[in-house]
Amino acid sequence: EHRANLAAVCAEEMTVNIIKFGGKTSNWIDINLCLEDDICQLRIRDNGVNFNPLEYSYDHEEFDIHGIELVKKISKSMDYIRAIDMNNTIISF
């Protein structure tokens, strides 16, 4: 249940970011949640502008943790690849 809650928070944060900053009027987002052995993976794919969340940093003093920084903090790992003009992010818990 704990990992499901983490996955829900991460899915919401990443999806909101894609919708706000995807740079297109017709974005699409594909979200999959996979559980294999003891690893829970949230896989997010979108056709927005090229954006690597691993390279993102938010340095604003008003917030301790902000959006993608929150996802990085609560996940076990995060991977990204740009393939076939799509952003592919895999977040593990």
Q: What is each model feature region?
A:
Residues 28-38:
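Short beta-strand/loop element within the Bergerat-fold HATPase_c
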Residues 17-21, 39, 50:
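Amphipathic alpha-helical interaction surfaces
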Residues 31, 42, 89-91:
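Hydrophobic residues positioned within well-ordered beta-strands of beta-sheet architectures
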Residues 72-93:
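Flexible, glycine-/charge-rich segments associated with ATP-binding catalytic modules
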